[in-house]
């Protein structure tokens, strides 16, 4: 479904803002690539950040990988204008589909001056969450995007955004300049488990990964038994590789 079709399906949007639709890509979120994300962020930086008449940007996105794209935009959009990522948990053909109302709320948030300087946000199901913290917890319920540690930035009340506190920058947040970036090296993410073998690491390396992030289930007391052996000396020796 193209962006203009989405806009035309919710005419109430025109009561909130003058909307200009731009089609960056039209793929399922499971097929979103780093190249698409780089192009998207550059377009927002150029068209939205560079135009004083633009209040903000709304990105419609499938929910399979929505939080990943939102986090990327949070790190790469270089202005204080709101970038709102929105999706739907029900298909457009479902009874009481949530997509149209979510889109209306997302446009409302993006058009609201109080939304500035909050980074990229995710808006679904009356919730306003920071893209820096939001996670998807359930593939089958409407209220699935959560901000468990930080909490939500706000919520929609009577069709208007209500923020719980003023804008604040998350601790450790880093801005990334992608103005000269054309592609991003492949980085694989591997999850540790009991009896994990180094073969999974070697396969990632042989398949072309330039970096590997290993999610180790470690407590504060120390390492656990499933840590792969000799990560540095055995894997790094195969080729230049970053392992985190």
Annotate the PLM regions.
Residues 1-47:
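ATP/NTP phosphate-donor binding region
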Residues 2-13, 130-219, 224:
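Accessory alpha-helical/coil subdomains and C-terminal extensions
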Residues 16-17, 52-56, 78-83, 115-119, ...:
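Short coil/turn connectors at secondary-structure junctions
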Residues 51-66, 207-219:
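Short acidic, glycine-rich surface-loop motifs adjacent to enzyme active sites
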Residues 59-61, 84-87, 121-125, 191, ...:
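Short beta-strand segments
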Residues 59-81, 224-231:
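Short Gly/Thr/Asp-enriched flexible loops that form oxyanion-binding sites at enzyme active sites
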Residues 85-158:
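Internal gly/pro-rich beta-alpha loop/helix module
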Residues 213, 219-244:
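CN hydrolase (nitrilase-like) catalytic-core segments centered on the catalytic cysteine
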